[in-house]
Amino acid sequence: MNASGSAPLGANSEVGQLRAVLLHRPGDELKRLTPRNNDQLLFDGLPWVDRAQEEHDAFADLLRSRGVEVLLLSDLLAETLGASGAARIQGIGAAVDPRKLGHTLAQELAAHLRGVPAPELSTILTAGMTFDELPVAANTASLVRRMHHGGDFVIDPLPNLLFTRDSSFWIGPRVAITSLALPARVRETSLTDIIYAHHPRFRGARRAYESHTAPVEGGDVLLLAPGVVAVGVGERTTPAGAEALARSVFEDELAHTVLVVPIAQARASMHLDTVCTMVDHDAVVMYPIIQDTLSAFTIHREDNGVSIRGADPFLSAAAEAMGIGKLRVIDTGLDNVTAEREQWDDGNNTLALAPGVVVAYERNVETNARLEASGIEVLRIAGSELGSGRGGPRCMSCPVARDPL
């Protein structure tokens, strides 16, 4: 613990004892989802929001019961906006887009938001705003206002904030602000950036990787062991993003090896953590259908730059980089059909609370049984509604403090 009684910030693995985590309790942004926009906003269905909140509250309570400090993004955001004028300006600037709204409406909306109380502004920045909710009169001299339907968004909602893993991650004692690939999620990083830059809890936190234009998402980043990072490249993270991240962590001496792992560009495997996560210091839960074909390019830091080797089989490349003989692999599901079903339902997307202790969705019965048969303690949570955005316990959590391995 530091002088404030909080755990020191940072993480050097996926499985070190979890001390503090950033979550986002689902809110009004999920109520913005409709059959017309859910695909654009990256949800497969329309969640029952009250039940999603109940499921998330149970998830947070489970973490607290295991001694984990739970930080809620909306609370941190409201506190930051209330304490920092610079944070308020930054948040409004990211949300109000003159290219979409035109100069007149953008100016009037920004002026209005500057006077909104911090808790209300926090809600607007996360849940968005429609034209019907504008304080600006309908007959204002704005063609944009007159031509839009009242239910159209002036500020888009951010339903994927639920998945706090993607917009930032900690590596060593530093935090990386990522660059999200799809338009529906781009603005999320502005909110995490505001919190890490201006909230007192994170005062002095140094950056590992500033948000580059080449996409990198936290769900594609696994801290396999101290100094060893795996980065998935597929639907979200690009080769350019992975290379930029590798060079950044090498320059800051946060890693000596980065494994770049190509994955299928498909909804079911949008991130590396949808097909593989760490459950112990030497064990992963992995989708068996890709086990024999998953490969990795190994990037090493060298005195005069970097070296790139491969592609080699992922499991052997990872074990070599981690300095262990072999990774234990626990398969998803029971057979090919069950494996495919449970992978789709985030059976691979576990959150480790300590070596050999993970949180998983209860619905993935066969995968959870396999984990327990391999000596892993499985803490089950409901996820019938939370899973509609295609994310599990790991996706919904950003560890900000883990004990080092």
From Swiss-Prot:
It comes from the Bacteria. Its main location: cytoplasm. It is found in: Cytoplasm. GO terms for molecular function: arginine deiminase activity. InterPro entries: Arg_deiminase. Pathway: Amino-acid degradation; L-arginine degradation via ADI pathway; carbamoyl phosphate from L-arginine: step 1/2. The active site is at C395. NCBIfam families: arcA, PRK01388.1. HAMAP family: Arg_deiminase (MF_00242). This is Arginine deiminase.
